[in-house]
Amino acid sequence: MSTNFGPDLRSWVATLQSADQLCRVAVPVDWDEEIGAITRANLSLGGPGLLFENILGHEKTRCTKFLTSAIGNRRQIQLMLGLPEGTGDSAIVRHLKAAFRNPVPPRVVESGPVTQNIVEGDDIDLFQFPAPKWHANDGGRYIDTFCGVVTEDKVTGRDNVGLYRGQIVDRDKIAKLMVPSQGWGGHFEEYKPDPMPVAIVYGWHDVLPFCAGSPFARDVCEWDMMGALLGQPVDLIACETVPLHVPATAEIVVEGYLDPDPATFALEGPFAEYPGFLGSAAPAPVVRVTRITHRDDPVLRGTLEGIRPGFFNEDSITNFARSAITWNMLEDLGINGITAVWMTEVSNGQDTVVQIHKAYRGHAQQVAAALWGTGGSVWFHKNVIVVEEDIDIHDPVALDWAMTYRVNAGLGDIAFYGPTMGSPLDPSTPPEKNDAAKYGAGEWTRVLFDATRSWEFEPRPEWGGRHFPPIDKVDPALEARIAARWEEYGIGIPYLDDERRELLTMEQLSRRLKDV
């Protein structure tokens, strides 16, 4: 595969390979469940990207290769962002937060290798591409799992690049899960009663699915954010059969129209979705394919859904971007004192932890109310935990401690809000309330856990005039003497690193937070 066209899937594969983060699987594998099971085990082990090059039934089809697990671990995220190995989770989020503040708009070019091969008319056949049947109970082969679905807002002319699942239901048809409260769901309404033009991008640089699966505000174009991460514009070319633009160096592009007429719908699903449970089947709108373009020797990109303890996936890794976007949104809404945000991986962002410099009573409640009012909250922020700066939001033990000793339900530290819109894929909601076609979304009752120190207590002399009992910590001078004599004690293990020494004394934190 040539890699001389700038940022694209091939340059990304080369980056992974040079960092020992790619495995080329040359032995025969089956698209029917085997790829899914291999991927599940590999992701659980934090393994490399997998490039399957010998897929049964696809030895001589238009596309013979399939890539997955290419942003499935932290090292791959560091590589994608140009960060050193060992960069911590908090630093990754901060890097993304800053990058998303500096959008780089795309530029339109005349041509690109994605049009090296053009497929039209009776030659269109989606089964020429090795889309897996990922799980035993899936309704069919899911080609749209880690792609970029491009639509345009008829009013503003702004592109939306989203990540929406799709199942092959015929040679030229893809049934799509449609949630009206999503970005492209709004576009779908604008085009009614006419079909909506759609372009689906399979395989470009992995900033594409990373951004397409992230909850940017409606006035933000994902192309701009991809450019921000790459440090250069995304080169786009015009499609021929739909009025849209796609990356000039994409591997595969499907053009078509999504019809709102229920008479054209097809059964989509079931599908084992991101919560780790099997979703249900339902009639869904269908993309009728009008044209396919692809590079020579193209590579299809896809990913495995289904998160549960011990089994994260590429979608959960996207929570780095989601956390950064949410942090920026809170700041844009005028919420002061936000010092960190983390949308947990196993919850796929349904649990959101926010660290604050608490400045007033009700600060945590303000944070939760702001989160619940954002457009992306249909999928995220079901449960919100707010903590202070002495709690490491990436440490589940620290969060457990804060939840145990700073939350008192009888004092209003737990608050419920709802029913509200929520994810239609959450199995904790009764199925009759998860009908996205009827309601536009599912239904949640949301919860805030205020795990900050209560300001309801009066300052007490024995607490040093604080509102809350002080944390037991070691005097810095004493700790320094212990560190100096550690080897002398003969304990036989290395002394604490700088991070844990600060945790022991809280010397730096005490200078900023009087309540510590």
Task: Give the role of each language-model region.
Residues 1-286, 290-516:
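Extended, highly charged
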